[in-house]
């Protein structure tokens, strides 16, 4: 049967299976011993029956296990599934769970073509065995399905049409109005760095300074300071700009938090407990998180610092529990404090929150200059970060690894949602009940309330999103029905918040003109990768974001409209670039890019358009190269001969590490958070994540392009990366703009990768060093099989021993 594109939303309810019993009352399960799937088995106990929903080989839903109804398991579970899949059938698979793996009972098939009209289908479907014969007693599964094609969505390709836009549906947190958002590029921006960027209403864009604002927020807190991090390092200082000194600004973060706790402020910290401190990836030179040092630093003080492992929920198999506990992380980066009211008039306090990609740890402080060598005796002398060489050290000199990142400050009702997320996590894993009791502070801390009038042109609407499950958050509903009402997804006896992925999908589907992405990773939609040398069903990077982007571009090509997607990623994921894990991730990235380009090339060919697919989808990395100046820092040692380190030092170049997790749509909507574009971050049951999606209702791209704070922020980022601003940048979807940006990035790549260098690189944005062949295959650039100064393949290498769950 031919496969058909299902692009939209599929509502599915799985009710029950009848008659799992053979004639004469004998137990059905004795019949299926020979059909054991993926089972080592510890001896069978009570049958635990569950059902899954698959679109061909992509698993898109799973029920809980039913233990005491082996003959007639009843689930009555509903699923809200975002699809971007080619499929001929929606497949319902019924299995019996084992401690390791599961036993196949059978599969039921509903042809996709029955769904295309959008009618509700409610029926009993025959369950078949592997040979497509009915299983014993003609057992059936009762299901209900209804498909809503994306083109019927009132928001499809129409952007945010008014301030009445209610936010992303089916989520745990509702959208909040009357908020204020501050957007941060990098940990610090020096004075006078950003040129005049005009906004609507005769205003100009003003940059904010992340670590200075966090320093001020901590210093001024009187009741609470709550912090979560993948890493928190006590030895860093937050204020380092000699032109912008603050009283007490030279204090380390650890001493600052101890000082605040001694003043009676409740300081609570949840820091990821890195169980792989001795694990699989250690040899790849991945950065230590300092979790043990941080815990020891605060022992015996009034700071409550809890090392927090990524514990699985209780419902998984033995294998799943091992995977979650050792492979996945707590990745949220938040700070929540009490703060004075904006007017500063009364003694009352409010809640203020920070959310984004920047951990409060070493290696994160940087400015848009991203110097490799020139800050080694100043801002980075005591904070030298270079984990891409096995022996990177300040004593051996640069290049250090510069760090580009994005963060946000949230004020108004949205700040309380971030607080509630912290409280849920603390109640689950924090141990002692030492959270601030807000009832006792009723007369001091005001309840959630707007900080901006709704008719103020600078007001924001903001919504909080997460990837997290009940293994990491307290108080999730216990039944699938209640979970669905709360905007959560039920899995294998696990309740999951997967709203970050949902937010990306909704934003991409709404997009009208362009999308700008900065992310540390870019891989996914593995169900649509080419399967020449892999079994795609074994990869499991099933989130749909790359496929949604490709389908958006295709829909615009078919409609004869311009649309451009810009993606900025690091040259390679942090670590030794030749190592197996880094090479495996680059291989997944290449497959993801190739899947997207193949769709674009097919759409262009179908319309008879001869155009470079990079005019529709274009990938960049960022890097720097600096000539040597007199009086520069001189290291006392030299790196190993014939190493990546010495080659990079002599060529005076290195990548700028892109750690951002951001997407801007049409200059009107922005997502900022901790979540990467990979399965770990988007899954919900793997790494824990947090993000916010926001827009200014008075600055929408309805009749003319949006020119609010999001536009100003994007232009500031483009100025940082390109070293200049241009009129064409006002219309990123235009062929003039994408051609200019691609030309500049090509030129900067040539300068970056050339043998010699006359002067500093004029801009940082580099073409990602790949080519796109006529059929959409991703190829090496001539002479660029390896990244400069390394022996690491740009296109990556498939790993034969690292499990995909680790690298996707």
Curated annotation (Swiss-Prot):
<feature type="active site">
    <location>
        <position position="659"/>
    </location>
</feature>
<dbReference type="InterPro" id="IPR000008">
    <property type="entry name" value="C2_dom"/>
</dbReference>
<keyword id="KW-0677">Repeat</keyword>
<dbReference type="InterPro" id="IPR011402">
    <property type="entry name" value="PLipase_D_pln"/>
</dbReference>
<feature type="active site">
    <location>
        <position position="666"/>
    </location>
</feature>
<dbReference type="GO" id="GO:0004630">
    <property type="term" value="F:phospholipase D activity"/>
</dbReference>
<feature type="domain" description="PLD phosphodiesterase 1">
    <location>
        <begin position="326"/>
        <end position="364"/>
    </location>
</feature>
<feature type="binding site">
    <location>
        <position position="659"/>
    </location>
    <ligand>
        <name>a 1,2-diacyl-sn-glycero-3-phosphate</name>
    </ligand>
</feature>
<feature type="active site">
    <location>
        <position position="331"/>
    </location>
</feature>
<feature type="binding site">
    <location>
        <position position="186"/>
    </location>
    <ligand>
        <name>Ca(2+)</name>
    </ligand>
</feature>
<feature type="active site">
    <location>
        <position position="338"/>
    </location>
</feature>
<dbReference type="GO" id="GO:0005509">
    <property type="term" value="F:calcium ion binding"/>
</dbReference>
<dbReference type="InterPro" id="IPR024632">
    <property type="entry name" value="PLipase_D_C"/>
</dbReference>
<dbReference type="GO" id="GO:0005886">
    <property type="term" value="C:plasma membrane"/>
</dbReference>
<keyword id="KW-0443">Lipid metabolism</keyword>
<feature type="binding site">
    <location>
        <position position="520"/>
    </location>
    <ligand>
        <name>a 1,2-diacyl-sn-glycero-3-phosphate</name>
    </ligand>
</feature>
<feature type="binding site">
    <location>
        <position position="720"/>
    </location>
    <ligand>
        <name>Ca(2+)</name>
    </ligand>
</feature>
<feature type="active site">
    <location>
        <position position="333"/>
    </location>
</feature>
<dbReference type="InterPro" id="IPR015679">
    <property type="entry name" value="PLipase_D_fam"/>
</dbReference>
<dbReference type="GO" id="GO:0046470">
    <property type="term" value="P:phosphatidylcholine metabolic process"/>
</dbReference>
<keyword id="KW-0442">Lipid degradation</keyword>
<dbReference type="GO" id="GO:0009395">
    <property type="term" value="P:phospholipid catabolic process"/>
</dbReference>
<feature type="domain" description="PLD phosphodiesterase 2">
    <location>
        <begin position="654"/>
        <end position="681"/>
    </location>
</feature>
<dbReference type="Pfam" id="PF12357">
    <property type="entry name" value="PLD_C"/>
</dbReference>
<keyword id="KW-0378">Hydrolase</keyword>
<keyword id="KW-0479">Metal-binding</keyword>
<dbReference type="InterPro" id="IPR035892">
    <property type="entry name" value="C2_domain_sf"/>
</dbReference>
<feature type="binding site">
    <location>
        <position position="404"/>
    </location>
    <ligand>
        <name>Ca(2+)</name>
    </ligand>
</feature>
<dbReference type="InterPro" id="IPR001736">
    <property type="entry name" value="PLipase_D/transphosphatidylase"/>
</dbReference>
<protein>
    <recommendedName>
        <fullName>Phospholipase D alpha 1</fullName>
        <ecNumber>3.1.4.4</ecNumber>
    </recommendedName>
</protein>
<feature type="binding site">
    <location>
        <position position="331"/>
    </location>
    <ligand>
        <name>a 1,2-diacyl-sn-glycero-3-phosphate</name>
    </ligand>
</feature>
<comment type="function">
    <text>Hydrolyzes glycerol-phospholipids at the terminal phosphodiesteric bond. Plays an important role in various cellular processes.</text>
</comment>
<dbReference type="Pfam" id="PF00168">
    <property type="entry name" value="C2"/>
</dbReference>
<dbReference type="Pfam" id="PF00614">
    <property type="entry name" value="PLDc"/>
</dbReference>
<feature type="active site">
    <location>
        <position position="661"/>
    </location>
</feature>
<comment type="similarity">
    <text>Belongs to the phospholipase D family. C2-PLD subfamily.</text>
</comment>
<keyword id="KW-0106">Calcium</keyword>
<feature type="domain" description="C2">
    <location>
        <begin position="1"/>
        <end position="125"/>
    </location>
</feature>
<feature type="binding site">
    <location>
        <position position="370"/>
    </location>
    <ligand>
        <name>Ca(2+)</name>
    </ligand>
</feature>
